[in-house]
């Protein structure tokens, strides 16, 4: 998903906002694809939330994509509802697509929260989830990408030209595990 979204939204020479600390693949794939990385800091004294004042002081004119990851890897920090609301407002103000990589939500939270619960988030945000963590299916490569129909069509155009899909048996097993909440 990280590759597909980056290919769909970022051209060489454009910028990607990446959390520090954060999942290294956001940086490595963006660099491979010719994007410039702009790190934004997550600090413990701020609950591992983005510092929106710091972000607003950056030159964001070439930023196309912003990665977030809540619950955060490697800190374990959880987003707050206010953080998600501010991310949506930030994305709309600066015409940036925010992607929340959310694979740990079902195992680290009693009440999982989604960025897409914020009104208007689907206009400017994408959210991933993965069954590799929540249902112990690593290597099956089964996950979810949720957004608006236009964004999804762009991502699917990239995906369909990279691979031919997941084996049907794996899809059926994943659907059953998800529907019955069988980890």
Residue ranges: model-predicted function:
Residues 4, 26, 87, 115:
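Aromatic/hydrophobic pocket-lining residues that form π-stacking "cages" and hydrophobic walls in ligand
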Residues 8, 28-30, 90:
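Hydrophobic/aromatic ligand-binding patch that stacks against planar heteroaromatic rings
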Residues 38, 42-113:
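Active-site phosphate-binding strand-loop segment of PLP-dependent enzymes
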Residues 1-15:
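Phosphate-binding glycine-rich loop
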Residues 13, 58, 85, 177-183:
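Short, intrinsically disordered, charge-balanced linker/junction segments flanking boundaries
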Residues 120-183:
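Conserved core segment of the aminotransferase class I/II
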Residues 14, 35, 93-97, 121-123:
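A short helix->loop->beta-strand "cap" motif at the edges of active sites that frequently abuts
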């Amino acid at each position: 998903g990280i590759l597909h979204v980056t290919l769909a939204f970022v051209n060489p020479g454009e910028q990607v906002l990446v959390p520090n600390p954060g999942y290294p693949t956001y940086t490595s794939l963006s660099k491979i694809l010719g994007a410039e990385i702009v790190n934004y800091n997550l600090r413990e004294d701020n609950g591992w939330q983005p510092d929106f004042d710091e972000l607003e002081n950056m030159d964001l004119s070439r930023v196309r994509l912003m990665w977030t990851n809540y619950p955060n890897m490697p800190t374990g920090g959880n987003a707050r509802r206010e953080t998600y609301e501010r991310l949506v407002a930030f994305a709309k103000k600066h015409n940036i697509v925010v992607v929340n990589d959310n694979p740990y939500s079902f195992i680290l939270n009693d009440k999982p929260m989604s960025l897409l619960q914020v009104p208007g988030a689907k206009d400017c945000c994408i959210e991933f989830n993965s069954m590799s963590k929540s249902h112990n299916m690593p290597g099956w490569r089964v996950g979810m990408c949720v957004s608006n129909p236009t964004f999804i069509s762009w991502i699917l155009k990239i995906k369909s030209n990279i691979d031919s899909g997941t084996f049907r048996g794996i899809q059926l097993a994943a659907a059953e595990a998800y529907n019955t909440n069988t980890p």
